Amino acid sequence: MKSTIKYLVLIIMCWVCGENLQAQPYMFRNVVMSDGLSGLLVNAIYKDSEGFIWLGTDNGLDRFDGVKVKHFEFRGVDSGRKKRVNCITETDNKQLWIGNGIGLWRLNRSGSELQRIVPEKIDCAVNALLADGDVLYIGTERGLFIQKDGQLLQIQTDKNMLAACNRIMDLCLNEDKSVLWLATVQGLFSYSLKDGQINSWHFRENVPEADYFRCLTRIGETLYLGTMSQGVVCFDIPKQTFAHTVSLGCDVISDIS
């Protein structure tokens, strides 16, 4: 693992050195509440197919067009915790989806209104959204939901809806899109999109805090998972084994990409 990381660092250094010959200066600008930002704590950032930057804060959803910020209200939601935006994504049909503290929302672009979707089924926090074409994978506090062809399917990793492993924090697909990987607060799970089979792996057996996976991403045949107490750990998909990566100086990882 260390040799792989050194190799990647070397590639990046070579690329940077080459680019410096024709490098253009980057311009940074901060967007603050005086610009219209609804809150200083930004939990999610997403760039849509039209080039808009969507910002999910503790107070709702904002859109930044490069000049100004427009705020979108969650109508009927008063509590700050319930307003908190956890995730944003867009399906191929240009539908923008938002997960917040109480459920799933969709933006009606024509009317610029946020509409709550299937509240009778998804009545809990939505922590992760993953779009694949027009299919939407929804990770919630009470399991996985899949919206496809107008149908909503619910999958639970445990029959007990309140089990910790049903708290899904992040999602990603494998390379051939046949398996969906779930980062939960109690282990790593896979869900076969072919036959519905569910498998699980634990970083450290009988050590619950070591299995609190906050986020994940995939590079080739390796998953990288951010934890709440163990830093970044990797999972070799073919070998089905965990390993530590190099120390980052902090063991609490809130996001990874």
Predicted regions and their residues:
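Carboxylate-rich, polar loop motifs that coordinate divalent cations or form catalytic acidic clusters
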Residues: 1-257
